[in-house]
Swiss-Prot record:
GO terms for biological process: negative regulation of DNA-templated transcription initiation. Coiled coil: none annotated. It is found in: Cytoplasm, Nucleoid. SUPFAM superfamilies: AbrB/MazE/MraZ-like (SSF89447). Forms oligomers. InterPro entries: MraZ, MraZ_C, MraZ_dom, MraZ_N, MraZ_sf, SpoVT-AbrB_dom, SpoVT-AbrB_sf. This is Transcriptional regulator MraZ. Keywords: Cytoplasm, DNA-binding, Repeat, Transcription, Transcription regulation. Its main location: cytoplasm. The gene is mraZ. GO terms for molecular function: DNA-binding transcription factor activity; transcription cis-regulatory region binding.
Length: 142
């Protein structure tokens, strides 16, 4: 399980370290993919990515919508590994997609991580926090 918010700066090669506590969970590699509907990068441990892929196979969504979802997730995904110092290099297409400049935020989101440009994250975090309580209240009503 991933949680917490971590701030980093990209080095001249577009790398940044991941928190030491989460590195063991990523020893088999991770998959980076564009956030669906959000300007961030999803980072899934390989085992979680495989679970996601399997769950999508059994979804009852219309075939045309499923093809679009598969394209959005899988065609733009990258299989990456941390280097010996625990650093992650962001692929250029994903950096561009998420608008990542120098400062990045890594946010733990249960079974995966999200990588955001710091400025974009600040506005998203505020919106998420405002809506979270409304969502919790709705869940409590049911």
């Amino acid at each position: 399980m991933f949680f917490g918010e971590f701030e980093y700066k990209l080095d001249e090669k577009g790398r940044f370290p991941l928190p030491p506590a989460i590195r063991p969970s990523l020893k088999d590699g991770l998959i980076l993919a564009p956030g669906t509907g959000e300007k961030c990068i999803y980072a899934y441990p390989l085992c979680e990515w495989k679970k996601l892929a399997e769950s999508l196979k059994s979804t009852t969504v219309a075939p045309s919508k499923m093809r679009r979802l598969n394209r959005a997730l899988f065609a733009l995904a990258f299989d990456v590994n941390l280097d010996a110092q625990g650093r992650l290099t962001l692929p250029a297409p994903l950096k561009t997609y998420a608008g990542v400049n120098i400062e990045v935020i890594v946010a733990g989101v249960n079974n995966y991580l999200e990588i955001w440009d710091k400025e974009t994250w600040e506005s998203e975090k505020k919106a998420s926090q405002e809506q979270a309580w409304q969502i919790i209240e709705t869940l409590e009503e049911h």
